[in-house]
Amino acid sequence: MQINFSKMHGLGNDFMVVDCVTQNVFFSPAAIRRLADRHRGIGFDQLLVVEPPYDPETDFHYRIFNADGSEVEQCGNGARCFARFVWMKGLTNKYQVAVSTKAGKMLLKLENDNQVTVNMGVPEFEPSKIPFRAKQTEKTYIMRVGERTIFCGTVSMGNPHCVTVVDDLELTDVDTLGPLIESHERFPERVNAGFMQVVSRNEVKLRVYERGAGETQACGSGACAAVAVGYLQGLLDENVKVSLPGGDLHISWAGEGKSLYMTGPVAHVFDGQIVL
C-alpha cells in the first residue's frame, strides 16, 4: 500500500506526519519501527497521525507513536507540526484548531512566521495521575538512581515527566541517567527524563531523554514540564525561555490550576510517498 506523508520538525525533534482523514492506513508497531529507522526507513523521533474527530467539539484526533512503535499520550513539538500540517494540506482553514489526544483536548493556534502556540492544559502533580509511586504530592522527591541519589520534580503534561535540576548541563551524563530514570520502578508507565540548568528566573537550559525515543533535539512537553516544576519549586517566573539543543521555546504559566502555554517554530522539510 502506498501512502503520502510529510517530514516535519520542531527544533530538530522530527516527525513523519500522515493524513488518515483522506487515507485509510493502519500502522503496526513493527511497521512504525521500520519507518523510524534512519538508515532503512524515513527516520523520525515520532510518527504523528491525523484522524477524523472522535469528539464533535474538536476538529481532529491526534495520535502519537514513538520510534519504538509504542503509542504515547502527548507530544508538544508534534502538536505544533500537527497544526501547520492540517492547515498546509487544506484539511482545515482555521488558524485555531481543537484536537483530542489520548490524554485529553488541546488548542493549537497558528501564529506569524511559522510559530505555533499550544495550550498544553493544566499541569498535573498528583502522583497517581502521572503515574508516580509516592505517598503524597511533594515539590521535590528524593530518588535513588543506579549509584546516585537525585532530587527531582514530577508532573504530567498529558504524559509523565521527571525533571532534575543540575548545576551544569554539559557535565550531566544524560546518556547514563536518562534510561535509568526512564525505566525506574517508581514510574509504572516509564517516564520522560528532563535535566534542567537554571540560568535565571526567566531562562533555563534543558536536555530531555524521551520515553521510547532516547534523547531528542527538543521536547515540547518536556520544556513545559521543566518550567512547571521550576515554577513550583520557586526557581522560575511566569514567562521562561527554554533553550534546548535544537533551539528555543517560550513557555508561559501563571501557576497551579492554570493552563500552560508553549510557543515555538515549525519546519516542513519535504513531502513523500512510501510503500507500507
Swiss-Prot record:
Q: What class of enzyme is it?
A: isomerase
Sorted keywords for this record are:
Amino-acid biosynthesis, Cytoplasm, Isomerase, Lysine biosynthesis
An individual GO BP term: lysine biosynthetic process via diaminopimelate
A single GO CC term, please?
cytosol
Reaction(s) this enzyme catalyzes, per UniProt = (2S,6S)-2,6-diaminopimelate = meso-2,6-diaminopimelate
Q: Return the InterPro entries for the record.
A: DAP_epimerase_AS, DAP_epimerase_DapF
Q: What is its EC number?
A: 5.1.1.7
Residues annotated for substrate binding in this entry: N13, Q46, N66, G76, N77, N159, N192, E210, R211, G220, S221
Where in the cell is the protein located? Cytoplasm
| Catalytic machinery residues | C75 (proton donor), C219 (proton acceptor)
Q: Where is this site: Important for dimerization?
A: F270
Q: Which family does it belong to?
A: Belongs to the diaminopimelate epimerase family.
Tell me the protein's name.
Diaminopimelate epimerase
Organism for this UniProt entry: Photobacterium profundum (strain SS9)
